[in-house]
Structures are given as structure tokens and as C-alpha cells.
Regions:
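Surface-exposed amphipathic alpha-helical tracts and adjacent flexible/coil segments at the periphery
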Residues: 1-26, 30-33, 37, 56, ...
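Gly/Gly-Pro- and Ser/Thr-rich, intrinsically disordered tail segments characteristic of DNA damage-repair
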Residues: 80, 114-115, 119-128
């Protein structure tokens, strides 16, 4: 008997209304956003109620949902107005709130009935009994702690029917389930109340202090300044394991990331899910393309977190091992004229005549070409466009659509293609 596989939700981050619309257009089944209160991303361009309402209406056109993260740790007095806030979210049409603090969970459940509640990863759910506990309190979904292994995930799925949401991509906090007080000490900003200053990613000088007395600098003994941050997670080539083990929602981290990141990563995970559900062979055929695509937006090395083993020093960024993307995001397509094969693009970065670029769009469509016939908004032929947000026109040999993105190889790099169709990026 053939096993029927459930299609998991692709859940994307959206720090702004623009990013929400991009995520939905690029295949997100749901997006998670932050409001003006109770979240953990104070710098993410959080949504007003009016923006939430517009986002909900836009997502609905694509059959997508909007969740709101309200996962801060409550201190005395923070609860004032929470009930009214949750009722407003419910009335706007927010599909669920993502919460970790029991006080906020209680307030949402009692004062905004009908609003679905999901348990945040901050609550460190690592076993099925925990999921059953929260189910008894009315929660419908639990975001597993990032520290859960694939073996544990499979066992949890067998023993509970609570919806499971699991991270598949993005930054990994160096602290357990994100509960960090380093920012409190280093910058007087509470990471558990939205003020994380990412102190773990700062560069530090190390000193050897045996017995806490002598102070010897290790500066000459290590190659770079020390940091204590983790590499990023990527499960793009392990999507079959997530689907086979019954994960209900594949979560992508990154509400503060760019539309280049949101569009690329969402596009890839949607394509991965579609391909595997069509056939394992289809997934294997595009797997390497998906992995290669991820590296175009990666800013750190990528690993699989805790899913297959406990991370070692190889999964930590102890020095200057930052991944520098070879591509830069340069424009978004506004319109395309089939007759003249001309695209109107809104510039986001410097564009030069002759740049090697890649167009990509929803449905994992992409092709490479060169910038030709570059004109400014007044129709003047130009060799270089340095001003962001300017409308430009270029010649494009293949049809593109409004909302497609354009990325360019960074200066001094070119792609060389081999006879087997594979490419290698080299310095020009």
C-alpha cells in the first residue's frame, strides 16, 4: 500500500508589507510577521494594524495565511492592553499568533476566543508529552525547538497529532532556543523582549586566565578575532526527511532579511516540496540546483543544525568564515513588453551595461543574460546606473513578469559553462 504524504506548509518570514507580498508571490503558503507589540524583532519594520489588514487581504488572494509572532517574555505590567490587541488581530483576520509566555497564551485564549494559538520555539518543546500538555490547553500547533533531532522529530510525530512546525532554514541562535542574556549584559538590551543586539556575532579578543589570575592575550595564537555565533541552517537537500516524518509546516527564519533572500529561499523550498511530492526522482533531479540557489543568498556557511548530529566546532563561526555571496540583488521587474523584448526594472543596486545577470521568478524560473541597451527613466542611453529605486529599461531576450527579480554577479566574476551544462564562477 502506497503511503499518502501530506503537503507541508511553506512558512516564510515577512518583516515588512513588501516582503509579505514577495513571499506570497514566490510560493509561501503562510507568512509570519511582527506587530507593534509583544514580539522579539524590534528592528524588523513591524506591522501596524492597517498594514496587517492589507497583508491579510493580499495573502487571501493567493490562498495564503498570515501569522503574528507575539513571543516576548512578559514582565510585570507588560500585559496591559494585550487582550484588546489579540482581539484586534482576530478581527483583522490573522490566522494565528505565535506565543511562548503562558501569560500571553492565557490572555489570547480567554480574551480573543477563535484566534488560533501556536507555541513559539522559545518555549523549548522537545518531546511529545510537552506537545500533549499544550494541546490540553487549547494550542493547535507547536514550533519545535531547534535542538530537536530528526530521530526525535519522527518519534514525536508518531505519538501526537498536534501540528508540528519545524525550522528548515535561517540563522541559528548560539543560546538554547534563543533564550539569551548576552545582549542584556553587553548593550543593556533585552533579547527576550525584542532587543537582541547579536552580541554573539561581535569580534572578541581572547585571553588565557588560568585560575582567574594571569592575563595572557591569545591574539597571536589564533588566526582571527573570536566570535561565538553559529553557522546558518539549511535543510533544502533534506526536505524528503521532513515530509516523510510528517512535519506540517516548514519554517524559514529571517524577518529582517531582504526581499532577495525571502524570494529566493521561499522559491526553493516551494520547488523542493512540489518536486518531492511529484516523485523522489524529480526532487533528486533538481536538488543540486536548489542547493546552488541557496548559496546565492547565503551570508554564512550552511549546515543542518541539530537534525543529524550535535553541532561541533565545525558548525560555529569562530573567525572570519563568513560566506560572501557571489551575487548581488540589483533590480525588480516592473513590466515587460513582448513586442520590443524590453523590461522595465526598478533598480536596487548599481547596474552596469554588460553586467552578467540572472532573472528569476516564482515557480523556480530562472535564466542568465547580460545587461544590454540600458536606458534611464527619461529614455537616455547610459552605461551605468548608480541611483537606487530608479526606473530603467533593458533588453531581455526571454519574457519576464512583473515581480521577477534580477541579481548580478559581483564585479570581477563571470560564470563559465562546461560541455555538460554545469557552470563554475571564476574571476574575470
Amino acid at each position: 500500500m502506497t503511503k499518502t504524504l501530506k503537503r507541508p506548509e511553506v512558512l516564510s518570514p515577512a518583516g515588512t508589507l513588501e516582503k509579505l507580498k514577495v513571499a506570497v508571490r514566490y510560493g509561501a503558503d503562510a507568512v509570519f510577521i511582527g506587530g507593534q507589540a509583544y514580539g522579539l524583532r524590534s528592528r524588523a519594520g513591524n506591522f501596524t494594524f492597517e498594514q496587517m489588514e492589507e497583508g491579510v487581504q493580499f495573502a487571501a488572494k493567493y490562498g495564503a495565511k498570515v501569522y503574528v509572532a507575539a513571543n516576548m517574555v512578559m514582565h510585570e505590567g507588560n500585559e496591559a492592553g494585550a487582550g484588546e490587541w489579540f482581539r484586534k488581530l482576530r478581527d483583522i483576520g490573522i490566522a494565528a499568533v505565535i506565543v511562548s509566555d503562558p501569560a500571553l497564551i492565557m490572555i489570547a485564549a480567554t480574551e480573543a476566543p477563535g484566534l488560533e494559538i501556536h507555541l513559539s520555539t522559545q518555549a523549548s518543546a522537545t518531546n511529545y508529552e510537552t506537545l500533549e500538555f499544550w494541546k490540553e490547553l487549547g494550542l493547535t500547533r507547536v514550533v519545535l525547538a531547534r535542538e530537536v533531532s530528526m530521530e526525535e522529530l519522527a518519534e514525536i510525530r508518531k505519538r501526537t497529532d498536534v501540528e508540528i512546525e519545524a525550522f528548515v532554514h535561517g540563522a541559528m541562535c548560539i543560546s538554547y532556543s534563543g533564550r539569551c542574556t548576552l545582549s542584556n549584559h553587553m548593550s543593556m538590551r533585552d533579547a527576550n523582549r525584542g532587543g537582541c543586539s547579536q552580541s554573539c556575532r561581535w569580534k572578541y579578543d581572547l585571553y588565557d586566565m588560568p585560575f582567574g589570575q594571569e592575563r595572557k592575550s591569545l591574539k597571536g595564537e589564533i588566526p582571527e578575532e573570536f566570535s561565538m555565533s553559529a553557522v546558518d541552517m539549511s535543510m533544502i537537500d533534506h526536505i524528503p526527511d521532513m515530509i516523510e516524518n510528517g512535519v506540517d509546516s516548514l519554517k524559514i527564519e529571517g524577518r529582517m532579511k531582504s526581499i532577495h533572500y525571502v524570494s529566493t529561499v521561499t522559491n526553493c523550498y516551494k520547488a523542493a516540496v512540489d518536486a518531492y511530492l511529484e516523485s523522489p526522482e524529480k526532487f533528486e533531479a533538481i536538488k543540486q540546483d536548489l542547493v546552488d540557489e541557496m548559496w546565492k543568498v547565503a551570508q554564512r556557511e550552511l549546515a543542518t543544525g541539530f537534525y543529524y548530529s550535535i553541532p561541533t566546532e565545525n558548525e560555529q563561526l569562530f573567525g572570519a568564515r563568513r560566506k560572501i555571496p557571489e551575487y548581488k540583488f540589483v533590480a525588480e521587474v516592473v513590466a515587460y513588453d513582448d513586442t520590443t523584448q524590453t523590461a522595465t526594472i526598478r533598480q536596487r543596486n548599481v547596474i552596469n551595461e554588460g553586467d552578467q545577470v540572472e532573472f528569476y521568478g516564482p515557480g523556480f524560473r530562472h535564466f542568465e543574460t547580460y545587461i544590454e541597451n540600458l536606458h534611464d527613466s527619461k529614455g537616455n542611453k547610459i552605461d551605468r546606473a548608480p541611483n537606487p529605486m530608479e526606473l530603467l529599461t533593458i533588453k531581455v531576450p526571454q519574457p519576464v513578469q512583473a515581480g521577477d527579480m534580477v541579481r548580478a554577479l559581483k564585479e570581477g566574476l563571470i560564470n563559465l559553462y562546461k560541455e555538460d551544462g554545469t557552470s563554475v564562477t571564476v574571476r574575470a
